[in-house]
């Protein structure tokens, strides 16, 4: 992964990718630790999540980014809302999530790691994959990180 990123190749991180390399010294044999991966590469600051249960409302922070092309209106997620704030300097938040009684948190953003384009989302609960907005988000993320043109219309 380090060589991939050093070569300027893109990366998409979903959900638990934010803490995949931080085993806190408890990793299995052969596990490579990279405790700074979340902040350095993804641009996040994962420090836990809210309890599963409340539905997360997801809204755009901007309509002008190619990753958001064709995504109309707010949508919801049944997954636990992650707490990645504050994002690293240089990360660009695209979507914010909120649950009742808690502050909003970024749930999708872009970052640059060297020459590598990076997209991360804390969404990705199994039910999210049934959402047309989430599927469009992921398609757009692939297109943006790889330099392809974005979709121009929402999918049914």
Residues covered by each model-derived region:
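Solvent-exposed loop/turn segments at secondary-structure junctions
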Residues: 11, 17-21, 73-74, 99-101, ...
């Amino acid at each position: 992964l380090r060589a991939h990123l050093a070569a300027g190749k893109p990366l998409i991180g979903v959900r638990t990718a934010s803490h995949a390399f931080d085993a806190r010294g408890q990793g299995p044999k052969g596990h490579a630790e990279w405790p700074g991966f979340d902040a350095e590469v993804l641009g996040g600051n994962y420090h836990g999540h809210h309890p599963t249960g409340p539905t997360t409302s997801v809204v755009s922070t901007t309509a002008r980014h190619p990753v958001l092309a064709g995504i109309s209106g707010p949508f919801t997620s049944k997954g636990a809302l992650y707490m990645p704030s504050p994002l690293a300097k240089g990360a660009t938040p695209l979507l914010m999530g909120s649950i009742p009684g808690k502050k909003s948190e970024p749930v999708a953003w872009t970052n640059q790691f060297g020459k590598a384009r990076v997209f991360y989302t804390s969404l990705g609960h199994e039910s999210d994959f049934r959402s047309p907005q989430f599927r469009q988000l992921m398609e757009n993320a692939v297109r943006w990180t790889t330099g392809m043109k974005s979709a121009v219309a929402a999918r049914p």
